[in-house]
């Protein structure tokens, strides 16, 4: 067992493993892509105050300002976690969801309601449904109905903008191995970014098949 070890394709070549299972996860997609409106990416995503949820929680000294917008087009618990983190920091937070209800995939397990109640008790929290960011400015976001640009657009204050989109699979090692003709298998988010329990199930099945 090797813990806390970076491995690249060159190191894997020397291990002479009987089977290689790639479970390298995924990374945030930050190009402004919105699943509900793929032809209209968000403008202004290349600014310093536009970050991922990972950027948010891994840099506690980041200057966040007073107002934050969380843009959720994935529909899972990640957006709720980002909002709760920001509310606890004392920011006024607006959650913008492209869906017709808040984080629909988190509702499956009843995780959304208690989180909203906590955030409403802790501080300023606002929810906008069936909306998307069309453009990010220096201190605000231009928000409107999904796939209806120009219709009743709203300016939402935003010193920090957190984008929560479907992630990109991190499969570079797998692609190198396959190009060399070596057998390898993808599991978890490296195969298809989903909620955590699916990745756990993939790992469980892969381990059982090796026994």
Question: How would you name each of these model-derived features?
Answer:
Residues 1-30, 46, 52-58, 64, ...:
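A Rossmann-like FAD-binding core segment of flavoenzymes
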Residues 1-2, 10, 29-89, 178-195:
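Glycine-rich dinucleotide-binding loop and its adjacent helix/turn
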Residues 34-35, 107-109, 199:
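Short aromatic-enriched loop/helix-cap "lid" or pocket-rim segments at secondary-structure transitions
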Residues 39-40, 111-114, 203-205:
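Short, hinge-like loop/turn segments at secondary-structure boundaries
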Residues 84, 116, 174, 204-207:
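Predominant activation on well-ordered alpha-helical scaffold segments within soluble catalytic domains
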């Amino acid at each position: 067992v090797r813990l806390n070890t970076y491995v690249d394709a060159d190191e894997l070549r020397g291990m002479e493993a009987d089977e290689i299972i790639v479970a390298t996860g995924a990374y945030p997609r930050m190009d402004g892509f919105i699943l509900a409106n793929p032809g209209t990416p968000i403008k202004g995503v290349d600014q310093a105050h536009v970050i991922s949820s990972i950027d948010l929680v891994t840099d506690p000294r980041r200057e966040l300002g007073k107002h934050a917008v969380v843009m959720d087009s994935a529909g899972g618990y990640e957006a709720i976690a980002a909002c709760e983190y920001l509310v606890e920091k004392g920011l006024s937070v607006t959650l913008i969801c492209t869906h017709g209800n808040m984080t629909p995939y988190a509702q499956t397990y009843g995780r959304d309601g208690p989180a909203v109640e906590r955030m409403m008790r802790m501080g300023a929290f606002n929810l906008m449904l069936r909306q998307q960011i069309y453009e990010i400015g220096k201190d605000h976001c231009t928000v409107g109905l999904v796939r209806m640009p120009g219709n009743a657009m709203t300016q939402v204050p935003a010193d920090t903008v957190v984008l929560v989109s479907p992630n990109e699979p991190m499969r570079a090692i797998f692609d190198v191995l396959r190009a060399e003709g070596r057998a390898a298998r993808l599991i978890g988010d490296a195969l298809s970014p989903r909620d955590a329990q699916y990745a756990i199930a993939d790992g469980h099945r892969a381990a059982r098949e090796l026994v």
